[in-house]
């Protein structure tokens, strides 16, 4: 059962980060905050691969962020926002492997903003009669 749940998690978080990439600095700033949070979880769970991935993602986003504040000089595009979402979703799964309840709840709380934005977007489309996809 973990494989289908993990796949839904990865696809959901990846697309959630892509959907919130409409405003300058939102996806990259939120991604940096979430990456730092998940890196701390991986550190506490002694998941050193997750710590390495989290620090790399955090460093890349912090380095990119000043160029993406309004007026933005460069943009993530779909590829960048999808990469951030994929990295965060895998990082959350990596921290979940050893730590128990804390590692389960904190990634959900950290990723609540993009996930809720996605759910609201889907609900808005369904209510207006448009297709979800």
Give the ranges of each region predicted by the language model.
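Alpha-helical transmembrane segments
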Residues: 26-133
């Amino acid at each position: 059962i973990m494989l289908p749940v993990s796949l839904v998690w990865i696809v959901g978080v990846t697309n959630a980060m892509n959907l919130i990439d409409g405003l300058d600095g939102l996806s990259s700033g939120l991604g940096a905050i979430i990456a730092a949070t998940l890196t701390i979880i991986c550190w506490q769970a002694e998941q050193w691969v997750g710590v390495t991935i989290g620090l790399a993602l955090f460093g890349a986003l912090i380095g990119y962020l000043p160029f993406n504040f309004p007026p933005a000089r460069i943009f993530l595009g779909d590829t960048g926002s999808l990469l951030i979402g994929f990295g965060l979703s895998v990082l959350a799964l990596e921290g979940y492997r050893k730590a128990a309840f804390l590692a389960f709840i904190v990634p959900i709380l950290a990723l609540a903003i993009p996930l809720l934005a996605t759910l609201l977007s889907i609900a808005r489309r369904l209510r207006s009669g448009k297709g979800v996809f």
